[in-house]
Amino acid sequence: FFATGTGTTQAGLVCGQLIYKDPRKIVGISIARANHGGRQVVLDSIQEYLAEKKIVISNECMEASVMIDDSYIGPGYGQGNEEIRQTIREMLIHNGIPMDATYTGKAYAGMKKYIKEHGIYNANILFIHTGGVPLFFDELRFLK
């Protein structure tokens, strides 16, 4: 799981997954775009990279590997809500990990909901913190 916006992180992760035939799911939690728009951007980047490297992978495999969930966008890009702020607060207090409402905090809150809604239990889960630390300081006023 990770925050997906422009799609480049997701495209890179999926390229690695496809090239090395890794069966694990890579789920991008959209922080701004609806799935249909973001999905095509990611697919285009994957196709471009694989073509440049002369690696042949079926369109069907590529399409099956791009998982974007846009259910947790919330009020919009760069806008948090109390649930996202609570997630940021908990991660900072309990784990010492700063997050922001635009990217990582929103995606982490979305991941928690995704896991619960999809009944994922007793599984190893990886969340990739892709940055956004400077934006964390914008959230300080909400972390009291």
Model-identified regions with their sequence ranges:
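Glycine-rich phosphate/pyrophosphate-binding loop at beta-loop-alpha junctions
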Residues: 1-67, 128-144
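Generic beta-sheet signal
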Residues: 123-127
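Active-site-adjacent helical/loop segments in soluble small-molecule enzymes
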Residues: 62-122
